[in-house]
Amino acid sequence: MKLYIGTKKGLFIHAGRGIGKPHFLGDPVSMVLPDSDGTLYAALNLGHFGVKLRRSADGGKSWEEVAAPEYPAQPAGSQDKTPWKLVQLWALESDGKRLWAGTIPGGLFTSENRGKSWQLVESLWNRPERAEWGGGGYDHPGIHSIAIDPKNPKRLTVAVSTGGAWQTQDGGSSWSICAQGMYAEYMPPEQRFDQNAQDIHRLVLCPARPEVMWAQHHNGVFRSTDGAKSWQDVTAIRPSKFGFAVAVHPKDPDLAWFVPAVKDECRVPVDAKLVVARTRDGGKSFQVLRKGLPQEHAYDLVYRHCLDVDRTGKRLAFGSTTGGLWLSENQGDSWRCLSTQLPPIHCVRFG
């Protein structure tokens, strides 16, 4: 088992014997992808020097720079208020043949040559609804979740903060919005159920049952059992319905995990106690898991890409804004702290 941890100060790898020396020390790593073919990708956000993408064919022993997604020039006279410039590579996924990249300011890109070149998915970028997308945690909108149906890789669902969820059935040639049933408490009453105004924090699907999806939304937890055609509000979650991260078991669509927090005002664990919420029955009930987690003076926030489950469905790991990293080998019943001294963590992935 390898665990990849992207942080504000580099990429760390835990290979079972502890955490190794950092790669790209000092550079913010916004996303990492351990691809099924053994290739490792790391996205760096170097601020003034731009977004960079690194690729390794030997598990991180050596790295080479490959192309980062690039936006075309904004057309003359365009009224688009969103800049046509890459701000961050926020999501990175593979369907086995193609790479998919979600970015801020809201463009989706694809590569068919392992990152040597990228193409903007214009069919989504040119949707008129995009003009209404807005920034959530950032100044501009962004695609942070790319859920690929393993049984039909041409079916993708992406989530936008803030711009709802969008789905393609034909590999990106056409798109339809798919956030029916979600609600936005921050909008005026007449726009509460506007699908294009939904601030989804994270969206995942169950690989064995891809029609079942889970979403952690700014205003709650939602679940779909019909491939995102409709969403149901999951009200049983505790100790709060706010959070960023969600993970679903690879084979059991009813088993999912969340890391709740206090919404908006201060964004810390409820009562300063770090817990994980788990459901085994599709959201009808939840267990609050705390064994091995700090239960006083815990101010750890777990970002949307910082909770992951491995392919067996037994191991989970999550990292926090305060540099804490925890591992469970029994589906969350108990947790072991791997570190409390890492830089703020941006993403955690098994590989």
Which stretches of residues belong to each language-model region?
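Extracellular glycan-interacting surfaces
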Residues: 1-351
